[in-house]
Amino acid sequence: MVKIITGKVNAGKTTTLLKTYRLDRKGDGFAAIKKMNGNEVYGYNMLHLSNDNIIPWMVHQKYYQRDFTKTGKFGPFYLNLDLLAMLESIIDELIAQRISPIYLDEVGVLEINGGGYHNILKKLLSSGLDLVIAVRDDLVKPVASHFDIKDYELVQVQGEE
């Protein structure tokens, strides 16, 4: 089963995903934690849920100082492509060990366009394991269509993160 946590930008999708995981600490996965500089988004760190390891994921171009060995770019953000390779390796282990559910935050335009977690999400969907993913509300249908997710439960988040 795929559970999609959805809401508008800053509605609390990541907070809801973290609360869902922390209720019983079953499964494993990753949450994208927003890093602020005053009122501006500095970037995002990736939190590995089972061990609380934090790894830089994206840095806004305004603050980027060649922080990553291998980079990609999405909008105004530089991506840590080494992190993606590491995430894929960890997800492969979770699939092999049949760890469930697996959490992934956040799936969106980058993945629809073949980047970010695209390959990771394809593997997860093929695995048959339970998934919990965060998706912005205006992207639920495009994500479900692109990844051929037909059966899913929606968790609507109304608040602000």
Which residue stretches match the model-derived regions?
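Walker A (P-loop) ATP-phosphate-binding motif of ABC ATPase nucleotide-binding domains
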Residues: 2
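Hydrophobic anchor at the beta1->P-loop junction of P-loop NTPases
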Residues: 5
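Walker A (P-loop) phosphate-binding loop of P-loop NTPases
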Residues: 10
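Conserved lysine of the Walker
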Residues: 13-14
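The feature captures the helix immediately C-terminal to the Walker
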Residues: 17-19
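N-terminal phosphate/diphosphate-binding loop that engages ATP/GTP or pyrophosphate donors
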Residues: 22-74
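Phosphate-binding/switch loop-helix module in NTP-utilizing enzymes
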Residues: 65-109, 122-123
